[in-house]
Amino acid sequence: MLWIWQKKSNNVHDLNSHIWDAWADETGSIGKAYGYQLGIKHHYKEGDMDQVDRVLYDLKHNPYSRRIMTNIYNHEDLHEMNLYPCAYSMTFNVTKEKDSDKLTLNGILNQRSQDVLAANNWNVC
């Protein structure tokens, strides 16, 4: 998932695998899906950030917020996606253990489908 989250890429060549080739065009793009959606800059009072940078900002500055999330199921762009997002949103939160300074990062992945037999080892975060 680093090709989507770290590179904010929608190009299957960045994956270095052929599991998604069927959905890619001749350049390797899967359209306005996955990394493309995460990389779009949005305007916040703290400045312009994409979704990944916003998650990192919030985890650093307000780790107990219930608003730390991403969503890449953008209805406006679905017609330009070669593959509708299967894993379409993430919600993050931080918890603190009682009587301890230990913090735990929790993540909840929402997905509409999961190809367990064909792609489970590629599609997990």
Where are these regions (language model features)?
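Terminal, non-catalytic protein-protein interaction segments that mediate quaternary/complex assembly
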Residues: 1-125
